[in-house]
Amino acid sequence: GKGRPFLYFAYGAAVTEVVIDTLTGENRILRTDIVHDTGSSLNPALDIGQIEGAYVQGAGWLTTEELVWTDKGYLATHAPSTYKIPACSDRPRIFNVALWNQPNAEDTVGKSKAVGEPPFMLGISAFYALSDAVAACGNGSRYVALDAPATAERVLAAVQRQRDV
């Protein structure tokens, strides 16, 4: 293979702070700081909204959106009553988004870059912040497995395993 599979890359970084209840596994995102590469932003307010929404969706994917299957292979979590997607209240209490506003070197509209899907992956920072919080329940030097999605039940189980180490 030769060729160029992508016209350009959009980069981003996120740092997330969480808190966990070690008796129940309940958790909350307290703060997130994001910088995202938008190229020359065509509409900064719109781009920030897209970045925030994609982050919350990505964090939900890794913390609450659990697929449960029955013994017969049917999806049990197929409705809003059984499949927990993020709500407005699940966004970080402190949410800072900065745009890395450098013109795209490629010939794109207004030298801009995509902001709809790439920031989705920044939600991974919420999952790893939970993993760090679980590790802090021990001596902080050992990480036990935390399965995704990191539901309250899975966080609690990881805390218990961490304390047993």
Predicted regions and their residues:
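Cofactor-binding beta-sheet edge motifs in enzyme active sites
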Residues: 1-165
